[in-house]
Structures are given as structure tokens and as C-alpha cells.
């Protein structure tokens, strides 16, 4: 996983980059699935306003973390990551935080940045959607995320 400089990202006053960094450190150290799922949940809370249904710019690189968990961490971490991305689909950017400054490509809208990362991971998501391991409980979520990608970003989706 590429190192993310969470402190470099802009956001509202209640965006706490140190919480995102701490969640990533816990995820890297996690051995048990429940530890990894909790770290992913903490990352989700660090990069969004869950109560208002709004995204901070840090949600864009966090999407890569969730996609990596979907691809590599079956069980509770995979489900936590799928749930986060499905919940975010259609959310609005936090007012005043509508763009993400990508260090490689420049400024991008949050929805566009998030969708681009999911689009780039579509092959992996198809494999996960077809994977019956662990009882296959993750399959509907992976299929729904792919369907949402095909439908585009919509306030009604989230």
C-alpha cells in the first residue's frame, strides 16, 4: 500500500489526519480479522462525516485502502470495506471540501476520484463477486458496488 500523507490533505476543521494515520498503523499491525475491521471502521470515520453523509478529500486515497482490503482480507475486513464504499456512494462532499489534490494528476472532484479508483479495481471486484469462499456473504456487496459503478454517482444511491 502506498504511503499516504494524511496531514497534507485539506478538509474541514473536524477532519483529523492523525486519526487516519493511527487507523492505518493499526491496520498494518492487525493480525486478527476483527482488529483489521475495526481499523478500517476507524479510517472510515476519520475521512468522512458519517452522521451528515459527507466526504472529506481524504476519502479518495482511503478508497484505495478499502479496495485493497476487499481484495486481500476476506471476512470481516472485506465486509467492512465493502460496506464503507457502498455507504459512501452518492454522498456529497463536505461543503468547502469538494476536490482532492492528487499528487500525480492534480485536482479532481471527490466523486470522480472515488469512482476512478473503484473503476480501476473492477477486475478485482468481479473476482471477489464470484468468490464463494467464507460462505460468499461478501458477494452481494461486491456485485452491488460494480452495479453502482455502472450506474454512476447518484445522491439516491447512498
Predicted segments, located by residue:
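N-terminal "cap/leader" segments of large eukaryotic alpha-helical scaffolds
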Residues: 1-37
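HEAT-repeat alpha-solenoid elements in large eukaryotic scaffold proteins
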Residues: 1-2, 34-47, 85, 92-102
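Flexible loop/turn segments at the boundaries of HEAT repeats in alpha-solenoid HEAT proteins
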Residues: 12-14, 51-56, 92-100, 107-115, ...
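Core helices of alpha-solenoid repeat scaffolds
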Residues: 16-21, 55-63, 117-122
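Buried hydrophobic core positions in alpha-solenoid tandem helical repeats
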Residues: 23-24, 66-67, 124-129
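Short inter-helical turns and helix N-cap capping residues of alpha-solenoid HEAT/ARM repeat scaffolds
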Residues: 31-32, 71-78, 132-139
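Residue-level detector of extended alpha-helical repeat arrays and alpha-solenoid scaffolds
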Residues: 36, 59, 78-82, 139
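Eukaryote-biased recognition of C-terminal alpha-helical segments
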Residues: 107-114, 119-158
Amino acid at each position: 500500500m502506498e504511503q499516504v500523507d494524511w496531514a497534507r490533505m485539506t478538509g474541514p476543521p473536524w477532519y483529523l489526519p492523525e486519526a487516519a494515520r493511527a487507523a492505518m498503523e493499526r491496520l498494518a499491525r492487525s493480525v486478527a480479522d476483527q482488529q483489521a475491521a475495526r481499523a478500517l471502521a476507524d479510517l472510515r470515520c476519520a475521512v468522512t462525516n458519517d452522521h451528515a453523509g459527507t466526504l472529506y478529500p481524504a476519502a479518495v486515497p482511503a478508497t484505495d485502502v478499502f479496495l485493497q482490503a476487499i481484495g486481500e482480507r476476506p471476512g470481516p475486513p472485506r465486509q467492512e470495506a465493502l460496506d464503507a464504499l457502498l455507504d459512501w456512494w452518492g454522498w456529497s462532499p463536505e461543503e468547502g471540501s469538494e476536490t482532492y489534490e492528487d499528487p500525480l494528476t492534480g485536482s479532481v472532484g471527490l466523486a470522480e476520484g472515488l469512482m476512478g479508483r473503484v473503476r480501476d479495481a473492477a477486475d478485482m471486484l468481479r473476482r471477489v463477486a464470484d468468490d464463494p469462499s467464507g460462505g460468499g456473504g461478501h458477494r452481494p456487496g461486491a456485485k452491488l458496488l460494480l452495479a453502482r459503478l455502472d450506474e454512476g454517482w447518484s445522491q439516491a444511491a447512498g
